Amino acid sequence: DQDIYGQRLGFDGTSIVLEWETIEDNNGDGIDDFPNGGIPIATAVGNQSSQKVTYYSEEYSVIVWQDERYGSSPDIFATFLDEDGTPAEAYPIDGLPIVSSHDIDGVQQYSDLYQHKKPRVKANADGAFIIWNDFFRPDASGNIYIQKITHENNGVWDISSELIFDGIAVSEEYGEQSNSRLTLDGNGGVYVVWENSENEQKDIKIKHLDSDGNSTFDSDGLSICSADKDQVSPLVRKDGNGGAF
């Protein structure tokens, strides 16, 4: 199994200090096997990987990851930790699903398992926005989905999915959408950019969603560059005035 651990770093005026302590004695010999090893964040069965973390508020940070606790087809999970490393009240140990092919008890919802991969997260005190690559749709080539969560709710935006835990589509165009990035707009919304693979060529597209998950652009986003050959590796940053670079 591959698990996720975390450590909070502080500064005492002269040096970096480790704020979180845990004792892990796997051998029963009274000796800490991982001194200064941080605290467990996700240690469920299976692999937990592709983790991302960001500041949420003065009270919490938010962590998201790719989770295979229900098998080799990964889901996306998240948790909120306070300054002591304690999860928010609404989030149990090992987090809650953001998108999953299973219900809260781990019961598979479909005969086929679908993959949800490579989460990313940006946040402010109003909520955290999580994007991921989603392989639930019919062409299975990979689309981009998003969900807004808070320390009290692991799915703020309403969904029309057959899944219990899911998000809303950023893009469901034919072909693959990948290598997505996001940034906050400063007004409660979010910008998302990605590589759009269509007609054997990669272009760059962008989409803006407001705080309620409504798109202010075309349903599948706006084209940033569709010149001949491939355009790859997009990045996006807010401009401080509600727009983005």
Regions found by a protein language model. Give the residues of each.
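Extracellular, repeat-based ectodomains that mediate carbohydrate processing or recognition
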Residues: D1-F245
